[in-house]
Amino acid sequence: MNDKLQEEHNEKDTTSQINGFTPPHMSIDFHSNNNSNIIETIGVSKRLGNSVLSELDSRASSKFEFLKDQSEQQYNGDKNNEPKSGSYNINEFFQAKHDSQFGQMESLDTHYTLLHTPKRKSQHAIPQDRSDSMKRSRPSRSIPYTTPVVNDITRRIRRLKLRNSLVNGNDIVARARSMQANSNINSIKNTPLSKPKPFMHKPNFLMPTTNSLNKINSAHRNTSSSSTASSIPRSKVHRSISIRDLHAKTKPVERTPVAQGTNSQLKNSVSVFDRLYKQTTFSRSTSMNNLSSGTSAKSKEHTNVKTRLVKSKTSGSLSSNLKQSTATGTKSDRPIWR
């Protein structure tokens, strides 16, 4: 019987005939004892496969015997019908059984659908909506306000509220404190972070450099040398003393070496303003008399000669001095006023 079913299936299957290819599941002999090949092709465990296949074989055999008995009874009852091709077509029997059992099944529409489905709005509902809107637009009568009836439940609720307010009176203060603390925290969070002040180094231009020190020292040395060179000792003589006697009496003053440390050393506290704008050299407006007076005051400390200057010199005395110097062949120094 199974061979016949397989042959009929192969005849109906046109894809396998056209392509000349039989799928692997059709070539499997399900009723053969060699179940290991089926398990290897399907890809399941042997223990599970053997148990499942044995159960299917037993069920199929019992079902086939039951159907075979019914088909023989139906064939014997219908004697007028001649058998087709010497055997009863079992496919028709299976189809009839399937149709009868499938017709008795409950349909999915009646089983899964809701009992009360929402209806669609019909055209009759439009004037009803309009009538409702008209009713709403009309001025409604004033409804008298009625105070709700005070029941025992409302009284109990009021008592509980009063009791909680009296017992938990300190909670209000605690809540106020917590709210204030939260506000302080929020204010601290909202304030921008103050950046730390960068470490400020002292500017280098405030400190004297080696070049500036050398320049200032050289300027001090030049001024000291010029002042010592220009300071010529003058002896204060009386009017009656002649210039020759004056030259004979006066002796060259020994120059005392000036301590280099006093002028050369510069204090570290000299600022930029003093170095830039302080006048280290003498201006042009100062005359030679002022310089000579300043240097003569310094030279008086080293000399013990007590002399005084002549108040005024006439042009005659100056010319006589020049004549005497040329006659004797001696050279006279230039006057200080030149």
Swiss-Prot record:
Molecular function terms from GO: microtubule binding
Segments of this protein annotated with the region Disordered: 1-29, 67-88, 116-146, 215-263, 284-338
Biased composition (Basic and acidic residues): 1-14, 242-254
Signal peptide segment: none
Composition skew (Polar residues), residue ranges: 72-88, 284-297, 312-330
GO cellular component: cellular bud neck; cytoplasm; microtubule cytoskeleton; nuclear microtubule; spindle
Localization per record: Cytoplasm, Cytoskeleton; Cytoplasm, Cytoskeleton, Spindle; Bud neck
Phosphoserine: residues bearing it: S165
Iron is among the record's keywords: no
Alphabetical GO biological process terms: cell division; establishment of mitotic spindle localization; mitotic spindle elongation
Biased composition (Low complexity): 216-234
Matching InterPro entries: She1
Keywords on record: Cell cycle, Cell division, Chromosome partition, Cytoplasm, Cytoskeleton, Mitosis, Phosphoprotein
Any Pfam family: Msap1
Keyword Phosphoprotein: yes
Function, in words: May have a role related to the spindle integrity function of the DAM1 complex, which is essential for proper chromosome segregation. Causes growth arrest when highly overexpressed.
Family: Belongs to the SHE1 family.
Note, other: Present with 264 molecules/cell in log phase SD medium.
Protein name, UniProt field: Mitotic spindle-associated protein SHE1
Originating gene: SHE1
